[in-house]
Amino acid sequence: MKLLFKFDDSSFYKSTCVFLNDENHSWRDEYVRIYLDILKFDSSITLADLSIDKDYVSTDVMDAVIDKDKVYLGFSLHLPEDRPADYDPSKEIYYIIDREELMYLARRWYSFIERPVELKRPNYQEIIDSEEAYK
């Protein structure tokens, strides 16, 4: 998966994460892009803590459930023990990504948005290939 990290043209203080439009794009890539774009720092710490093998690390917009070395990204997700009485598994919409790959993308995203103000230029961008997580 390839993502493009860039600073918004209208305000170089706003960073944006978009998927790199290529023939390999999938809905999974789009879910990852949305999740990264709104990921909170405390959720990324939980994601990186490998001693946690099950947890709910959602954002304001999207649910995320860690299950050992996989992360489920989607909507209407619950940990098995937290499912409501009227739980309907057919309402779960999700895509699975390797936890290692998502951690790599989150680290790259945070290093991008934490750049010093003087280095945040409107035309600056980085292309991130998640395959680098496995090298």
Descriptions of predicted regions:
Residues M1-Y56:
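Negatively charged, low-complexity tracts enriched in Asp/Glu with abundant Ser/Thr
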Residues Y13-N21, V71-S76, S111-I113, K120:
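Short, well-ordered strand-loop elements centered on a beta-strand within folded domains, enriched
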Residues L36-K40, Y110, E114-V117:
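Generic secondary-structure transition motif, activating predominantly at the C-termini of alpha-helices
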Residues S51-E114:
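Amphipathic protein-protein interaction modules
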